[in-house]
Regions:
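Positively charged n-region of N-terminal signal peptides that target proteins for export
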Residues: 1-7
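Bacterial N-terminal signal peptides
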Residues: 7-19
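Extracytoplasmic metal-acquisition and chelation regions
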Residues: 22-319
Length: 319
């Protein structure tokens, strides 16, 4: 009689356990039955943590922090799609793909505190009410300090505050803290990656200061709105910033640019893209050197290291 009762009791127990799990708000599908030593044991199946990012800076930093972990990082937009076009992308042709990615995603990394129009989290939330927002510029819960914003800065994506090593380090801190809470088993590796990243930034800062001490002329003019944080972090002398499009550089404006460069003995003119030949000629006529720096690269830490190195080399040609 006993052999018959035991399987029946086991079946009833399993049914009761499933009901109890449902009452407790747990999904019975997330558990599997393991039978060992004559007993049935419930083991929760492990779900891989999935994180979405769409901007070069958020995806790039997340990739560095999550290297060597089992956290699944998904690029939610094409790598070459500018942030300014992501609103139309996620609400248009990219909507089906984001809907699919978001359905089982745990978090979306964005920059809404810096760029209010950042569409990733709001649009992803339409497909998954449980998805968590990670704001890389300022923690949603205020648990850590956010990035330092320059007074009077219009901000948005163009200002690129992460071109400052201090700000990039703060962004990495914010992201690592949230990612470690989302994936506790990956936290030791995330923390190790964070420490290595910040060590690179500290080394960059120390070496930059020592190298710039040898420069005779630290005056620069920027023809881009992307480098205010970079030149400020290096304590350079910014004579002017004029980010007008090439089409707006009239002959009179070009003459005025050349005169300003000469009058202020400007050493370097910065741009994030190749300017027109007319602008190049005006810079040369003003006695300055044009330097085109990179933005929105795949590896933001390496990009910052390269930009700083190129800028210092241009300012210290004889060292």
């Amino acid at each position: 009689m006993r052999p018959v009762v035991r399987p029946l009791a086991l079946a009833i127990a399993c049914l009761l356990s499933t009901s109890a799990l449902a009452v407790d708000g747990l999904d019975p599908k997330a558990f599997k039955v393991n039978q060992g030593l004559g007993h049935a044991a419930l083991t929760q199946t492990k779900k891989t943590v999935k994180v979405l990012a769409s901007l070069p800076i958020t995806y790039g930093l997340a990739e560095v922090l999550l290297k060597g972990t089992d956290v699944q990082l998904e690029r939610a937009a094409p790598a070459n799609l500018p942030g300014s076009r992501q609103v139309s992308y996620f609400t248009g042709r990219g909507a089906p793909a984001l809907n699919t990615l978001a359905q089982d995603a745990d978090a979306a990394i964005g920059l809404r505190s810096l760029w209010a129009d950042d569409p990733l989290y709001p649009v992803a939330r339409r497909s998954n009410i449980r998805i968590v927002e990670v704001d890389a510029a300022r923690p949603v819960d205020g648990g850590l300090p956010g990035i330092a914003v320059q007074p009077g800065s219009a901000d948005g994506l163009n200002s690129q505050p992460w071109q400052s090593g201090n700000n990039m380090g703060r962004m990495a801190d914010v992201m690592a803290a949230d990612l470690g809470r989302l994936a506790p088993s990956a936290k030791p590796k995330i923390d190790a990656n964070l420490a290595a990243l910040k060590q690179r930034l500290l080394k960059l800062s120390a070496h930059s200061e020592a190298r710039l001490a040898k420069a005779d002329n630290l005056s620069v003019v920027s023809l881009s709105d992307h480098f205010a944080y970079l030149v400020s972090s290096l304590n350079l002398d910014v004579v002017a910033t004029d980010a007008r499009p090439d089409a707006d550089w009239t002959p009179q404006a070009l003459q005025a640019l050349s005169a300003r460069l000469k009058d202020n003995d400007v050493a370097v003119v910065l741009q994030h893209r190749q300017p027109s030949e007319a602008v190049k000629a005006a810079v040369t006529a003003g006695g300055a050197q044009l330097l085109v720096l990179n933005v929105d690269g795949a590896d933001p830490v390496a990009e910052l290291e390269t930009n700083v190195d190129q800028l210092i080399k241009t300012l210290t040609p004889d060292t």
